[in-house]
């Protein structure tokens, strides 16, 4: 799937893959920061953490796709979702693994942060607390939401993993020798 680059702003490169923002992300971010005159540090932290969650999710897809031998052309971040553009996977199983990659990446980041907050509590620094809440609790809840088996969410593909795993099993069981013969 090719995305027209006219309305995109390149922001970085991750593992050889260009990452773009849609222009609306910058506009919405600027409007939120303008409206947050009381404490712009918290507003900036929340925005950065929010788009960090989307980037972490898309990087999870990117890593899974690259591990499965797909070429990844770009990652595009929109105000409420992201898209990782990669070549067609070799199999249905590979496509399911790539779908799980985004949620797995979110969980790898979120679970330790949630454990930290549950064990030690929040800090006395409001911007750090905002980052912990977004990258931890919010990220895990959006990851769970993303696993709903509804298009266009990842769950519509990810939950096909079990049937794909069963299909990969050999049709005939491997023939084994009886245990009493194997001692020779």
Can you say where each PLM-predicted feature lies in the sequence?
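Hydrophobic transmembrane alpha-helices and their immediate loop junctions
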Residues: 1-184
């Amino acid at each position: 799937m090719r995305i027209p680059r006219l309305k995109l702003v390149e922001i970085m490169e991750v593992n050889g893959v260009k990452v773009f923002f849609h222009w609306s992300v910058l506009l919405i971010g600027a409007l939120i920061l303008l409206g947050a005159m009381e404490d712009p540090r918290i507003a900036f932290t929340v925005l950065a953490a929010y788009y960090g969650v989307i980037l972490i999710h898309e990087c999870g897809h990117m890593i899974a796709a690259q591990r499965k031998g797909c070429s990844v052309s770009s990652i595009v971040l929109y105000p409420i979702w992201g898209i990782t553009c990669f070549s067609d996977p070799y199999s249905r199983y590979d496509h399911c693994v790539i779908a799980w990659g985004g949620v797995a990446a979110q969980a790898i980041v979120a679970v330790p942060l949630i454990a930290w907050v549950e064990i030690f509590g929040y800090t006395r620094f409001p911007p750090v607390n905002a980052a912990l809440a977004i990258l931890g609790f919010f990220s895990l809840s959006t990851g769970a939401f993303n696993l709903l088996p509804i298009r266009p969410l990842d769950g519509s593909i990810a939950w096909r993993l079990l049937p794909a795993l069963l299909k990969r099993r050999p049709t005939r069981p491997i023939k084994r020798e009886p245990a009493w013969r194997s001692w020779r």
